[in-house]
Amino acid sequence: MKKFCFAVLMLINTALYSQNYDAGFSKPIITENGNFTYYELPPIQTSEGVLIFLDRNLGALSNDITSSDSWGDLYQWGRATDGHEKRLSDTTNTIALTYRPANNEFIVDSSRANDWIVRPDDDLWNDSLSTNNPCPCGYRLPTEKEWRAVADLGYEIKPTGTGAYYISFGKGQLDLPCAGLRNAFTGNFQYQGMRGYYWAGDVMSKGMSGCMDFNKAE
């Protein structure tokens, strides 16, 4: 079985979440820094095999889908958990020289085609052993094909009752909040509660990171 976490997006970023925690099946997972406790959701059978997701987005303070606390952090694709992903992090236009920047700021620069590093590396997030994998030990981000397999289960965009929206796959097997994104050019937050952008761990083509996205109009 393949195990995943959810990284949420910044015009190039994302993490997974669902409210359907089954206490009879799930077990606690503790991240390396000990700040968050995640739980496994029941397995989901897809055309890409059996997939197991954690119960919330990386950095989410709650798994209550009606709360903005379920939105979680906003990652730049391929970047490690270093503080840049926090919604209160500062921005900088200094492009990173290495895959582990010395600062914890969100890197913006309109001249670099949505990238935060001088020499992009397409393998920074491609599996659980990748250099910058942001997931708890043993977990990784879904691939583009795995996201498509989840979408093939069928989906529905639903209101939370608090003015925001979420998407439900496979008749409630996996629910994801519309957590919005952080603009790669400006650092501004956009579409919070209205759209969801979830990173894939692999790239669609050289230099082009993939993500699964949805909005309330669909």
Question: Where are the predicted features?
Answer:
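Intrinsic-disorder/low-complexity regions
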Residues: 12, 103, 212-214
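Compositionally biased, low-structure terminal segments
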Residues: 5-7, 18, 26, 170, ...
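Enrichment for repetitive, rod-forming helical segments
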Residues: 9-10, 86, 94
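Surface-exposed intrinsically disordered loops and tails
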Residues: 27-32, 89-124, 159
